[in-house]
């Protein structure tokens, strides 16, 4: 990091005193009353050059090439952002006065829907502007992402982890912890103010090497909720290890814009496979905003203010947000509380204000958990608490001449503390346990079976990153090239206490059952500080230019990226090309590769312990009893764990007819080397014992022979793959002036063929052990191979009456298709393990065979999902502004309480629509 900072300073001073400025662009930024706007932000999109207006509203940008076309974006908090195309002429280019309009409901033509019109960094970028954000009462950024086409609208709630999936359809899970859901979410980068909010250092889980793998390794609650209502909840977890960043932690109040890249990201962005969400927050001088949102299940309060320190010391923008929400207001057992505060100091330096610097400090705290339910006989308590702190600095230096146009240095350090805790009462005659941590036969311990089982996972993730980026420009003939190149380094570690598990008081599921003496995977203490810090390095170069082909502009963004992740090097070519046939028709083509580094929890999951009881000679007196147990310690290395990979190709088009705007995108994305846990079944031969009880002394133990036992554990491998195809469509209509109403139609269709490379195992142990020595206990099936289809569409009407400062929005949403298909062969075993753990292959499966016929899986058991009909849902919102200072908004999800249901093939009831939820928001601008 030190070397990159020195390089930044060297480049900066090396260009001081260079050739005189030849081309200059200048303008004055004012409001509707002609008053100059100080601290307005100005950005040249192509060269990444920044400027800030002075007290007279003036800005100047030099070093632009003659006869080139650029776009200047001018923004000011509380005003509508303006984007102006400019053709640079030799000498001074004075744009005169640029008037920004105050952003309120009296403004004509405000954006209420996200747009996809080639204005972002990629062909398929979906832009969510501040205009839309202000009209969307949101508890978190997840509510704003409901604008993504072919995504089912989620009601405003903070009662479960919010992970984002892009361009994929998988068999739905109730927890969102399916292997493919986690892999897709983990591959989506959340970029805030130029920094990747990574989840690489998150290690909050039990040992994933235990039974059932990563998706079942989270701290979970018991059942909770009001009994007898049919809506009892179960197995909640607030952890989001192995997946993406929990979007609940990101408030929406101070966000200026969001760019959702579901396709091929620019080469600048690394450590991703499935897209990126680029968030820019408000910085600079602004009015005072006070917001209060009251919902049926939550209350939210927000305050923000940007004020000028002085013309010399710049401006500071400060914000704070508090949310208190419940799963059910009637019992308030399940609660989520969040407080976020941030401060951003912005200033420009130098005689010509060429250096712009933004320094940010953020702090957030989350209290998530379930209190003791009086109806729970186990007195279960669960909590998932955390705090996070980050400090970052973004510097941009604008050059007035020469090849280099801009250099930027981004630094960030983030640290947090995560606590996942659960406790429950255990009431049994006695328990068996061992604290041994080495492989071999050990004498275990008898202890009381009445205690409180406690599990605490303590994590302290640390993430730091440095990014150095350059933008340059040159011409080849009549073509202006804008070259961006740079490097980035990221560091992730976890200094938490780790899995502070006490084997003396094992929780349910990890203790040896005293009645059956069955084998189990047990738990031990694991210190997260033993995990070696993750260090990833990336380099990139990219060229952006426009060429004339047949007299029409061909816009090209082409680059290449190289990363070193977990010791593996990768090359990622990426390109976004679009051809402007006319002002009303444009076609696009994009192609690229992406790689996502494995996280610390996948690289260093910790040792797995498997216990096989060999003898339990117990007569009710500990001093006269003996417990022998075999402990197997497995140390996963995961040295060969490679970064996951995706390869995408995308076609896009935009058509404008009579003010109708149609955007269409089709894609094919192939994801390979997805990381998941794979079940390993091994056989080991161990001694058998008998014991003769001796009054007043330990039993006499004799070895009588040997027998095979099964050892079962999970390891991380690059096991997942998926092939995704689909299309997305967005259609915007012009406003019908007579009724002041416009319409928006969006939707799509996704198909995903997904599977794994490893065989799957299924336990079929009967209640009564048969005498047949070849009876199948564990079935072996071919690797997972399924297809899923998903289609969602919506029709939105927006009535905007500027004279009344009123907006009314109605959404009709339709679930068109939601289907999962598994191959017939996946239900037929290819082999099995018998009682002595001997593998027997099956060549011609016979369902009538008494030894293995019970291994056949029926379609009902596979729980294939198939939406039998179109399911509709309806949402409504209204917003009214008074004197441009007070705004009242009201919104309802599932406005008509439409609760259709259907019965699945397995006989379970499915309710696709959530219960109605409503809320009101009051905002004040001073």
Question: How would you name each of these model-derived features?
Answer:
Residues 41-43, 49-58, 109-138, 144, ...:
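N-terminal periplasmic "start-of-domain" segments of outer-membrane beta-barrel proteins
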Residues 323-443, 455-461, 913-919:
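Flexible loop and strand-edge segments within Gram-negative outer membrane beta-barrel domains
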Residues 549, 668-670, 689-826:
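Gram-negative outer-membrane beta-barrel transporters
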Residues 670-673, 677, 814-836, 848-856, ...:
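C-terminal beta-signal and adjacent terminal beta-strands/loops
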Residues 439-553, 773-783, 809, 824-828, ...:
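Outer-membrane beta-barrel transmembrane domain signature of Gram-negative proteins
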Residues 28-33, 40-43, 73-79, 89-134:
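Short, acidic, small-residue-rich periplasmic hinge/interaction motif at the N-terminus
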Residues 96-99, 141-144, 162-165, 191, ...:
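N-terminal periplasmic accessory domains that precede
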Residues 142-230:
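Extracytoplasmic beta-strand/coil segments of soluble accessory domains associated
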